[in-house]
Amino acid sequence: MSAAGQGYWDANAAALTFTHPLNLDWLAALPKAARILDYGCGYGRTLAELAAAGWTNAAGVDFSAAMIERGRAAGPTLDLRHIAGLPLAEPDGAYDAVILFAVLTTIPDDDEQRALMAELRRLIRPGGLLYVSDYLLQTDARNLARYEAGAARHGVYGVWDRDDGGVFRHHTREALDALMDGFGLIAEAEVETTTFSGAKVTALQRVARR
């Protein structure tokens, strides 16, 4: 992530609430001691849910130091780690499962998205799980106008700019298919979630096996 991107999340860390629902049933086959990584964990919301459900070996990493500080203050027992970039200082196959919630939306660049997915594949053991939740292209007039303006500015349809300087991306199913190529799909569902501004949007959730 660029320095500008990291600065955006640091500046907004105190105010943001993340809402993508965590379907614990999709993780039910994992032992409670399974090694779980929440990549792009923010302030640790999903880690707290995992801990409350009995998982004891989950860690979260994020580029935003302010997000990590917020999470540590609210949940001092959570394993929250600030990272500077890729690759992570972890061996191949270090994790039984990786959670990737609303992270691809924060990465407008194709090459950066592919680099992240390659790194997550490296970190997941053979047979391990990848649980992705991210925004699909929306069909309302407001977002369609954003996509048109974003395509003119960034050269990619689905990339758009927030008024506060944030740059985000929504995806086609085909784009998510390509990013998850080589993983075996186990389950998927469309879910309704809300944006930072409170707008209701549709996200696609998938759990797949490496």
State where each predicted segment sits.
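Class I (Rossmann-like) S-adenosyl-L-methionine-dependent methyltransferase catalytic domain
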Residues: 1-34, 39-87, 131-210
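Non-membrane alpha-helical structural segments and their capping/turn regions in soluble enzymes
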Residues: 65, 110-117
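A short acidic, Gly/Pro-enriched loop at the edge of an enzyme's catalytic core
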Residues: 86-98
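A short SAM/SAH-binding and catalytic strip from SAM-dependent methyltransferases
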Residues: 97-111
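Flexible, active-site-proximal loop/turn residues at the rims of small-molecule/cofactor binding pockets
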Residues: 104, 116, 136
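A short glycine-rich, Lys/Arg-flanked "PGG" loop and its adjoining helix->strand segment in the class I
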Residues: 114-126
